[in-house]
Design a protein with these regions (language model features):
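Hydrophobic alpha-helical signal peptides and transmembrane signal-/tail-anchor segments
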Residues: 2, 24-40, 47, 51-55
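Short, Lys/Arg-enriched N-terminal segments with co-localized hydrophobic residues
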Residues: 51-72
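N-terminal transmembrane-helix/juxtamembrane module of multi-pass inner/ER membrane proteins
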Residues: 68-144, 155-226, 272-278
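Membrane-embedded catalytic cores of phosphoryl/pyrophosphoryl-handling enzymes
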Residues: 74-85, 296-411
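Structural signal for the C-terminal ends of transmembrane alpha-helices
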Residues: 96, 142-157, 232-243, 337-343, ...
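Hydrophobic cores of alpha-helical transmembrane segments in multi-pass inner/ER membrane proteins
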Residues: 132-146, 222-235, 330-334, 383-396
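Interfacial segments of alpha-helical transmembrane regions
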Residues: 240-271
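Transmembrane alpha-helix/helix-exit interface in multi-pass inner-membrane proteins
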Residues: 260-291
Length: 411
């Protein structure tokens, strides 16, 4: 009977032509699924479902308000943003019941081990977070080049009541150019810092997994690699047309805003829940996994025990929920905004829509294999990243549309 009801609701959604009625049917469908999730999880999932539905409803309202005003918003159909969200919520429901069992089945760890010897898991522990730093660094390079190119634009002489600009105004223009150049250089320094953090974290994970120590040469090589990557990024951007750079600025805004919001939420939730990692229980020979808590429960025992201290563990073991690696990998979702900014062929679009989510899923799976996170940890990180991306994309594209209309009006 449950599946017949689902089928009838889905049929009504597809057959309804009126947008408002379709939203009503869709809301009812989501609430029905939420009610089912609440029942199977004994009401413990209720609060989370309500929050997610409210966020989804907000996104739908934004789309309704700007429908017809923004051509991009017409492409954001219901299935585009709702289907992945519903799937992730369903995964959270599954994780609420079988989180520990799934980790026991997938984690490649023996009792007493903290770092898994699994090559797949180790590989993505090293490179999993790289996208957030590389994309943010490249976005700052875009801003730097955009600011620098403004100083190269020809100055147009203006008149007011038959009088041209005075020498004083020309001197002000020179000061403005200097300020722009200083700003461009500052952005390059910050971009280089992001690139350096990417290499630093990658090397740190490698050293940690192999129980090695760093040295001055490694630090120097990281700095040189970051400078070289920044130089390459700027060289590529300077070879592009001014119009392309202007469009890439919107991509940079989406990338930086999405990454900042996602990681701020994820890092803010970690100390609130203080969830113990699966591999921390394995390292202390806790075969009963007595330290396990469900994702919706706060861990009251968030201080290191004697056994954990003797095992060489740190307070990082209490940062399981949500997954930082998965949140960092979720920054690749900003690449999905490129089809809205540039005209691209179908092959490129398909590659973006397949490879970006696939990378996030692979990183999430690798974190479970390493015993660093549970299914609910990585799923929540994906959900937060996806919601943040949709909200930032919607707002940014609306602002871009208004800005474009204003520019065309001034012409």
């Amino acid at each position: 009977m449950f599946f017949d009801t689902i089928k009838n609701i889905a049929t009504n959604i597809l057959q309804t032509k009126n947008l408002k009625e379709k939203y009503i049917f869709f809301d009812f469908f989501l609430f029905f699924c939420a009610f089912f999730c609440i029942i199977i999880t004994r009401y413990q999932f209720c609060l989370c479902i309500q929050v997610f539905l409210q966020l989804l409803h907000t996104i739908k309202l934004i789309k309704t308000i700007y429908k017809g005003k923004n051509l991009v918003m017409k492409k954001l159909n219901i299935l585009y943003y709702s289907l992945p969200m519903v799937c992730l919520i369903a995964l959270m429901a599954v994780a609420s019941l079988y989180d520990l069992q799934i980790s026991k089945a997938l984690a490649d760890l023996d009792l007493g081990q903290y770092y898994s010897p699994n090559f797949f898991g180790r590989l993505f522990e090293v490179i999993g977070e790289l996208p957030v730093y590389l994309l943010c660094g490249f976005s700052l390079c875009i801003f730097s080049v955009w600011v620098y190119l403004k100083t190269k634009q020809p100055q147009i002489a203006t008149t007011y009541k038959g009088k041209t600009k005075t020498d004083t105004s020309k001197q002000m223009e020179k000061k403005t150019k200097v300020a722009y150049i200083i700003l461009a250089c500052f952005l390059l320094v910050v971009a280089t810092a992001f690139y350096w953090v990417a290499f630093f974290k990658m090397i740190r994970y490698i050293l940690r997994l192999h129980n090695l120590t760093t040295n001055a040469w490694l630090y120097l090589s990281q700095v040189l690699a970051a400078v070289l990557l920044c130089y390459t990024s700027v060289s590529i951007l300077l070879a592009m047309k001014q119009q392309t750079i202007n469009t890439l600025v919107w991509f940079a805004i989406i990338t930086l805003a999405t990454s900042a919001l996602t990681n701020a939420l994820v890092q803010g939730l970690k100390p609130i829940f203080s969830r113990l990692r699966y591999r921390a229980m394995s390292a202390t020979y806790d075969s009963t996994f007595a330290g396990f808590t469900n994702w919706y429960q706060r861990n009251p025992n968030n201080t290191l025990t004697t056994a954990q201290t003797n095992a060489g563990l740190s307070s990082d073991i209490f940062k399981s929920f949500p997954s930082g690696h998965t949140a960092g990998a979720a920054s690749v979702l900003s690449l999905l905004s490129l089809p809205y900014l540039f005209k691209q062929n179908k092959v490129t679009k398909i590659l973006l829509y397949v490879l970006c989510p696939l990378y996030i899923v692979v990183v999430a799976f690798a974190r479970i294999v390493m015993g660093a996170h549970f299914l609910s940890d990585v799923t929540m990180a994906m959900l937060i990243g996806y919601i943040c991306y949709l909200v930032i994309l919607t707002v940014t594209m609306h602002i871009k549309h208004k800005y474009t209309l204003k520019q065309n009006t001034n012409l």
